[in-house]
Every structure is written in structure tokens, then in C-alpha cells.
């Protein structure tokens, strides 16, 4: 039984967003750094810092919160893990799903690295569907 780092960061971000926390601290690996770069580029998180504590690196994410006039707080970040260690889900470039008609993003692991669904369609490559974000 291995550790699923992608599910861990998705759960950490989702829990912090639901509890109105401003920051999240997650372990730094190559995969988590790639996913966090995509989240930052797409505007789902506000800031990222790399922090070192006794030979271990951590990423400190600053979450983006939007306030609604009717409610004091509204969760805008929804994440769902798709492919998992027990059941891998693959897709070619034509069958990559669109989330909310293109508003959300799909993060894929391809032969050219971790990228969004739009980038994979432009490059016409498929891969393993890691998660949905909307």
C-alpha cells in the first residue's frame, strides 16, 4: 500500500477551503509542484511559497476566497480525484471530458508532463486523468 499524494493534496485543499482557512501546508514533490503550478496559473489559488523544515520541503498555498453578497462565505473550489492507484483512468485527446462546459479544468498526466485538458487537446495527446477542478 503506497501513499496517494495527489489525493492528500486534494483533500487538504478542499478541507481548508471548507473551513475558511487562508493557507494550506502540503508536502513538496515533483507531482504536487506541477499540480500547484497549474492551480496558480488557472487562478484557483492566490500564492505559493516553498518552505524548508529539517530536510523536508513544504509548499504553503494561499487560497483565493470570494465573498458573495447574500452569504458571508461561498466555497468556490471543488476538487475530485478521478484516477486512483486501484483504478487508473486514461483518455485520448478526443475523449477528454469538459467540466461545466469548459469552465472547470481536468488535470492530466501525459508523456509530456502534467497539464490541463486544454493544453492536452492543443498538443493532441492523451493521458491519465488525475482530477477535476471547478
From Swiss-Prot:
Describe its function.
Answer: One of the primary rRNA binding proteins, it binds directly to 16S rRNA central domain where it helps coordinate assembly of the platform of the 30S subunit.
Is Ligase among the key words of this record? no
Please give the name of this protein: Small ribosomal subunit protein uS8c
Q: Does the keyword Plastid apply?
A: yes
GO function terms (MF aspect): rRNA binding; structural constituent of ribosome
What does the entry give for GO biological process? translation
* InterPro entries the record matches: Ribosomal_uS8 (IPR000630), Ribosomal_uS8_CS (IPR047863), Ribosomal_uS8_sf (IPR035987)
Q: Lineage of this protein's species?
A: Eukaryota, Viridiplantae, Streptophyta, Embryophyta, Tracheophyta
Describe the subunit structure.
Part of the 30S ribosomal subunit.
The places in or outside the cell where this protein is found are:
Plastid, Chloroplast
| Xref: SUPFAM superfamilies | Ribosomal protein S8 (SSF56047)
Q: Which of UniProt's keywords are assigned here? A: Chloroplast, Plastid, Ribonucleoprotein, Ribosomal protein, RNA-binding, rRNA-binding
Q: Mind naming one GO cellular-component term on file for this protein?
A: chloroplast
The UniProt family comment states: Belongs to the universal ribosomal protein uS8 family.
Amino acid at each position: 500500500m503506497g501513499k496517494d499524494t495527489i489525493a492528500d493534496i486534494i483533500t487538504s485543499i478542499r478541507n481548508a477551503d471548507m473551513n475558511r482557512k487562508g493557507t494550506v501546508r502540503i508536502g513538496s514533490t515533483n507531482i504536487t509542484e506541477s499540480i500547484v503550478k497549474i492551480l496558480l496559473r488557472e487562478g484557483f489559488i492566490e500564492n505559493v511559497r516553498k518552505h524548508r523544515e529539517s530536510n523536508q520541503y513544504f509548499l504553503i498555498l494561499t487560497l483565493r476566497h470570494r465573498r458573495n453578497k447574500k452569504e458571508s462565505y461561498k466555497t468556490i473550489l471543488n476538487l475530485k480525484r478521478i484516477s486512483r492507484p486501484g483504478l487508473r483512468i486514461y483518455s485520448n485527446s478526443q475523449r477528454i471530458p469538459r467540466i461545466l462546459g469548459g469552465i472547470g479544468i481536468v488535470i492530466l498526466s501525459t508523456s509530456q508532463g502534467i497539464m490541463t485538458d486544454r493544453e492536452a487537446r492543443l498538443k493532441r495527446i492523451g493521458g491519465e486523468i488525475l482530477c477535476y477542478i471547478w
